[in-house]
Amino acid sequence: MADINSAFWASHLVEPKRSYKYKVDWGDGRTPWYLFSAVDLPKYTLGETPVHALNHTFKYPGRITWDDITMEITDSESIDAAGVLIEKLLQAGYAYPTSPNVYRTISKQGCIAAMGILRITEMTWDERIIGQWTLKNAWIKSFDSGKRSYDSDDAVKISLTVTYDWAEYSANPEGSRPTMG
C-alpha cells in the first residue's frame, strides 16, 4: 500500500498553474502587461486524410492548423489602447482613403512588423516564469473597440482576434525547478 505522504496532494512541490498568473507582451514598450485582461492560449487542429480500402477507411494525420486566439484589452485614458491598435494598423500599411492617390496596401510583412513578437508568459505565485508561448508571424485579424453604455460603469474592453502561423512553447525558460520523484 502506498504511503499517504507520497501522494501528490501531500507534496508542497505541487502547485497548479493559475489562469490569472500571466503576462502578455508584444514588444512595443507602450502597452503594459496589466491591460491585457484575458487571452486564449494557442491551440491547434491536426487534420486527417482518409484512405479508403475496400470496406474500410483508415485515417492518417494531415496538416496542422494553428487556431486564432482572442485577446481582451482594458482601454485606458492614460495609455489609449485603441489609439495604439489603430497606429499598428497604419504601420501595417493601411492608409485612410482621403484622396484618390492613396496606393498603400496592407502586407503580411507589415502586419507582422507592426504587431511585434507576441509572447504569453505563465508565472508562479512568486513571479517565476514557468512557461512561455511565442506566436510566430502573428498579426491582428480583427479589432472590436468595445461598447459604451449609459447603463454601465464597467471598464471599456477591446477585443482582438490574432492569427499566427505557429506557436512555440518554452517550458520553464528560467531554469530548473523541483519535480516530484
Residue ranges, per PLM feature:
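Glycine-rich, low-complexity intrinsically disordered segments
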Residues: 1-181
